[in-house]
Amino acid sequence: MTRATGASSSLDDRALGWLRYLYRKATTPDDWDRAGQPHAHWDATSDPPMLCWHRFDLIDSTYAIGLMADRTPAWREVYGRILDELIFRHTGWWAARDWLTQIGHDPERANYPDLYRLLIPAHLWGDYDVPGWTANGVEPWGLQMDPIGADGNLFFKGFFLVMLGLHLRTTGDERWNDPFDLVRDGENTFTWFHSAIADHLHEQWQRTPDGCHCENTKVWPYCLAGAGLGLQYHDLLRGTDHHQVFTRWWDDVCRDRYLHLDSDELPQAVTLYYDPIVEVAHEVPVFAGMVPAIYLAPQEPEGARRLFEAGMRQLGLWEPEGPVSLPGPRASATALWLAREWELDALDTALTRAIDEQYEPSLDASTGEFTWGFELDEEHPRGQYNGTMAAAQIASEGSWWRLANVGPGSRFSDPTVEGVDFPTVALDQAWWDTDREELSIGTVPMNQSVVGRSTTFRVMNLDDPGGWTVTDVATGEAATTSLVDRGVEIRTTIDRHRFRVIR
């Protein structure tokens, strides 16, 4: 695999530090079945009432892994382990807890705090469920306990498709296209697999031209943009044509009716959600409603950029001069992410400076883990915000677009690094250059205390392993190696090394 245009071929210390943190978090045992309890480090706190559920931490932790895998495509084992852990948790009862427990209308809807007024049409205040209350069981759908098979609950199955697509693109492993159990709660146990979910969503979307709903009864451009991205991954990797339902919905409904991008002027307000039962499109200022832009960017980049620009202009951030006021952790992270995706250098510079000054980037010297504190003074780093900020940290020009529009190429059969003693050792570089038939590898120690220890790793997928040479780039000397089946084992010390593997 030769390097894609605009792609960086290495990871910095922050990215590797966050990878160490997420690896520990994902591999710490816990139980997401009904009788169990997710570990306290999984975020079920951020941005109530819509996103304060554990599964959004799983989802938001996925994106940076996909972006990192395109930086080091010849080293995938750690990414695959993390993604498997995230996806398995998403099959548990706790991932669907809102849909499984919020039955009927919210009994507290007459007592909502005034903060929720932005989220509810004024004429329905006091007699309408707030966004985030799923209302499973209300008519005309009735009780539907399957979180994927239900007519609603798009925000569960749509973002899950993104996770499954990123797993396949990162690993090439078909394990999640074999049937697996979901929820696992007695009679409420449901069997699905990647393609079945994509087929089901495609069929549902064909029947609902306004868009599938999340909570009963709300249709969200934000969640539909995410679901469209999940279908786009399935098409890219499995050769289906499911994404056409998104394209039709975008052309016929979303672009003009929901997001008001049909004018030369940028929109000042957009539809947060549409309720087809009461026939209300709830409008909010565009700075609060530009959230679909991050998911639209790989699908409809022109529309996504106009939506983003409208929101940034409303916040006074589009063409920053000097210090800026941050719009909150999640919004700041997605803004930085898109600034890097589209090479908006002034915005990137201003946001980076403010984020580093205000959001407490922190490196734990003993573990090599990197996280952001966000001035929250909490025991565990806030998961959803950290996952999104990690993606922004790793993003580069066009990197998010490439994930959904350019396949993984031949990386799964190209020379690949395995058996790295992670997290003690990490790779900041692992790239196979097809034209030169050369594999570049860079090792990084967890911290100074481990430097000098012995370590080994393997380079696999080598035809005729005895015909390959491994060189330490710094010294120009041959590295110490031994032959294994279809590969070589490299024996070295833990430190910052550069190796070149060439025929």
Short names for language-model regions:
Residues 8, 12-23, 62, 76-94, ...:
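Hydrophobic core segments within long, regular secondary-structure runs in both alpha-
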Residues 185-196, 200, 204-330:
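Extended ligand-binding clefts on enzyme/binding-domain cores
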Residues 44-86, 210-239:
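Extended hydrophobic/aromatic-rich secondary-structure runs
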Residues 106-109, 260-267, 446-451:
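Intrinsically disordered, low-complexity coil segments
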Residues 73-219, 224-225, 265:
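Extended ligand-binding groove/face enriched in aromatic
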Residues 471-489:
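Solvent-exposed beta-strand/loop surfaces of large extracellular or lumenal domains
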Residues 1-46, 50-58, 62, 67, ...:
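Terminal, non-catalytic domain-edge segments
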Residues 103-108, 271-274, 375-376:
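Short alpha-helical linear motifs
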